[in-house]
Amino acid sequence: SESIGYAMDKAILYGKGSAARMPLGIVTRLAQTVAPSDYPANAPAWVDLHTSNILQIGGDGVTGAEFWAELMQATGATYTRYSRGNMFWAMNSKTYAALKSKLITFTATGDIVANLFGSLPIVTGDIDVLEFMPDGDIVGGYGDLYLWTQRAGMTIEQSREVQFIQDNTVFKGKARADGQPIIPGAFVAININNTEVTTVMDFAADTANDAQL
């Protein structure tokens, strides 16, 4: 079930959309430069967000207040009238450590502190550590504006026959779902190393739907 949960997180961020029989990921939508041919006629007007909501900030020489001011300005691209909910910020542990390093300071008593404990300071919003994300990339926004639909409940099955000789029990978990950001402008992808944001992510082969496999 944990593996399925990580797969869902990865699909929400980087899913390739209906053409690949997958949910449409936040970063994938932000990176679009033209409206897809199957874009729904009754959906809100398609907007090109690949420059306004995919951003590069920071770099080796940017620290302290200057860095946090840049981050605050970049996260402001998530402006929307459609949510008053909490924000989230997904990143890997190296990026989390880099953010923490930019907060290190000495107290009056000589103690070293870095006040970053699961929530992004100043910007606000919970931090979700996902190790499949590239170093330096942060993806986030208003999570309640991503529509996720379970097409079928999660099932977990087991079999002893498939590796009977090895005396192993094999477990198989599966779930079917769809989703897409309903207000894409409520999300942003940022790289804090002043390099390009990764917009394409590899997924394991789909043995259920690909006739070539």
Task: Tell where the protein language model's regions lie, with residue ranges.
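Long, contiguous amphipathic alpha-helices that act as assembly "spine/axial" helices in icosahedral shell
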Residues: 1-41, 79-96, 154-183
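Alpha-helical scaffold segments that mediate packing/assembly in large oligomeric complexes
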Residues: 1-73, 191-213
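Short secondary-structure boundary/capping segments
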Residues: 33-34, 103-108, 188
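Flexible, glycine/threonine-enriched loop-and-boundary segments that flank and lead into catalytic domains
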Residues: 67-72, 104-108, 152-154
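C-terminal structural cap/anchor segments
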Residues: 84-132
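Short acidic, gly/pro-rich beta-turn/loop elements at beta-sheet edges
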Residues: 99-101, 150, 181-183, 187
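C-terminal hydrophobic structural anchor segments
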Residues: 118-161
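Hydrophobic, glycine-enriched assembly/anchoring segments
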Residues: 162-213
